[in-house]
Amino acid sequence: ETLVAKKSELSTQRAAAEKVLADLKANEAQYKQVLSEKEAAMESQQAEIVRLSRELAAQSGNTTATSGGYIWPCSSKYVTSPLGSRYTGIAGASTNHAGIDIGRVGYTTQAVAAKAGTVIISSYNKYRGNYVVVSHGSGNTTTYQHLSSRSVSVGDKVAQGQVVGITGTTGVSSGPHLHFEITENGKIVDPLKYLTNYIKGW
């Protein structure tokens, strides 16, 4: 192999490597933009949940939370992702997880109300998928996301343990699971503060 041919080969390899690097940087920038848009949308939706919960409390004259504790929102207790910052698989990027993910569920597993309350949202969006939000009074809510189907409508009063939907993988989801959130006085709290005997899967 001649020196000229070798230089030409190295030049081609360098150009290919530079293109790969440029593509990676472009993808990283695009990912950061998408992540920023998602976080902004989720914050807006969370504010709407708080508003609806407080509006319901004002209309009903009930400014105190329903009594009693929380039960598991599905039959599985296998938690695959806890509340808080988590790695997303892209270098340098993480996302703030506002609840817990419960795995080892399928497309027929029932999602049930962790506490009695009133349905304030039963809807779909591209991030949460099919989701249901139940108000328990005084700015306290529970949220059930990525459902394959929803079993309740806005305004429905649900008992603790009543089916609100069927688990699935709608919205931004890598597989069947139930994303579950609890808020108290409009603030996100760790569901594992109340849900005991969980199996750690992270």
Outline where the language-model segments fall.
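Alpha-helical oligomerization segments with coiled-coil/rod-like character
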Residues: 1-67
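Catalytic cores of peptidoglycan-degrading enzymes
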Residues: 68-202
